[in-house]
Amino acid sequence: MYVRAVSRTRPPISRRFVVTLTVAVVGCASQSSSNVDWPVYQGNHDHTHYTTLDQITPANVAQLKVAWVYDTKDAFQGSEMQSNPVILNGVLYAMSPKQRAFALDAATGTELWSFDPTGGKFTGPRIRYRGIVVHNERVYFNHRYRLFSIDAKTGQKVPGWGNDSGWVDLRAGLGRPVDGLSVSASTPGVVYKDVLIIGTSVPEALPSAPGDVRAYDVNTGALRWSFHTIPHPGEFGYDTWPPNAWTYAGGANAWSGVTVDQGRGMVFFATGSASFDFYGANRLGDNLFANSIVALDANTGKYRWHLQGLKHDLWDRDFPAAPTLVTVTRDGRRVDAVAQITKTGHVWLLERETGRELFPSEWKRMPRATLDGEVAADSQRFPTLPPPFARQQLTEEGLTNRTPEARAAALKILRANPTPHPFTTPSLRGTIVFPGFDGGGEWGGPAFDPETGLLYVNSNEMAWIVRMVPRENKSVFGARCAECHGASNSPTAPSLTGVHKRLTREQIVKVIREGTGRMPGYKTLLGDAVINDLADYVITGKDVPTSAATTDPFFSKYRNHGYDIFLDHEGYPGIATPWGTLNAIDLNKGTIAWTIPFGEYPKLVAQGLTNTGTDNYGGAIVTQNGLLIIAATTYDNKIRAFDKTNGKQLWEAQLPAAGNATPSTYMVNGKQYIVIACGGGKNDAPSGGTYAAFALP
């Protein structure tokens, strides 16, 4: 798959804004003239989303008003905007839905400059980027396979950085030719001393690039070191793959970002699964360093330690967020640790220097695989504490009771897809994955309060269905594309329905040739004639024969039928509420401090069904003085503030589109602001292109 949006029947969502944001007059602050930055992605190098700013308090947060709104004017149907803005010295840096980097006056929202990496020739489709890096008056950001360095004051490319065009090609230096594949970086890197350390996003079906984590010289763009997440001969972990897997295997990539302990000189990252996601006969073994938490020497890229959270992943159980650096109290002493959330709703807590588990884990026997050629891991490891923040298995007792008809529809689906174990392997009949492919935890990551030891995690409570089918090689689409897009041109997700209405034929050909997001490009593997056949199929539905099984070295015996969410007959979740939660986890005790439903469906609210929880994407920020601030909810388009001690809601505001991003907070001229990207676009929700900032009047 290369996108997460799911084209299934969903409840209708209003295409108009409930409330139009109105810019409030913001006077000069009298109490202070200080500036406080949000200097890096997620607020600090520890990725804690934490701030000591205290002008906005639990007592006055309900008085927040819109301070300014900036419209990128770049929204388009299906676009998303997941950027967490960086604020330095009164200037806000972020990205638009069309991947323009820009700078604003952080007090007024006035644009200072913008840089369009496409030169005004953006042709889509959507690509999600979650932020940028600002360091020593340079801005580093990624567009597809190009990593740019631009002047933070002018927005102009830095001459001579990388190649003569002012960018680094992320496809270079991966140990094998990947020019025809998609290699990008949806999450910004981090700077340590004079290197920019960054992970990548790559296709989740073969052909795919390896997920090397790399460090580039911030001054020149030269590659300083590289860590092979799919080990080469002689490297640790090589024997957990088939011989020569490093020459063809893909994935095991740190798509969710990296975290640096600046004092220790250590870099931490968590990886995704290996390609293919759901059938691993071509990658038999444990597959280090896929699905692993890894620590390296940030100076050299040398291995320090790892913990593999899932061996030989068959369920797309990527680690969904970068590690969070925390300090906790264990056995009466303070311990620097790494906290890692998972899609399954678990939290790993590891001693930072050694990777030692601070709470014990346990090994559990796993079901055997049923697909021909597949060999599943016989056991998997799970943390015993804290308890999971998401439900672990779907039974009849856990189905929806919204209406009798909804329950009957859900019961029919459950019985058609028997799943006696949470890790029942993918099958021809169908397997329920719960929590689903989008968690549990997701890429927004947790917020951490260093004073209380509480870790705040928003969670999706959604079941998905994976059903494998024998791969057809009778048609070009069946052999090359159905792995992600389903067996017809009207799949569950990502949808190709209506693509020809949004893109010209030339644009469709370009996407097939060059790839986009996690979709690979096929110009090298297929050639122009087959690419044109595929474009014709997308437009007309007319396919042509192929002999992929004998000509394609990456041919797989099975493919996933599609990405199906477990929904009732009206398009609502087929499981019992809550369908999304917000959780506070005590890392000192290993307990859940509180949990609440998070998000609502406006149509159900109108029917009297409130507090259901919904899909949510993006993280929270936590303040020293008692607030937890988060948008994230997909359907109600709200940003909210909660009492961090008990989850009581203190404030909410309507946004022009869903804030599927993490907010930033900062101070300019003595006034504190909260800003959120309002990009929408998730699960067929309306797309937006604005940034909204709030402040006290």
Regions found by a protein language model. Give the residues of each.
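Repeat-blade elements of multi-bladed beta-propeller folds
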Residues: W38-Q42, G78-R100, G124-L147, L181-P207, ...
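Bacterial N-terminal signal peptides that target proteins for export
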Residues: V3-V18
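Extracytoplasmic electron-transfer domains, predominantly the class I c-type cytochrome c fold
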Residues: R138, S184, M266, S475-G478, ...
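Periplasmic c-type cytochrome electron-transfer domains
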Residues: N44, A390, E397-L411, R415, ...
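Mature N-terminal segment immediately following signal peptide/propeptide cleavage
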Residues: S32-Q77, P85-I87, N583
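Glycine-rich (often Gly-Gly/Gly-Pro-rich) flexible segments and glycine-rich loop motifs
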Residues: P360-N417, P573-G580
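Extracytoplasmic/lumenal domain signature
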Residues: A59-K73, A101-F122, L147-G180, D212-Y248, ...
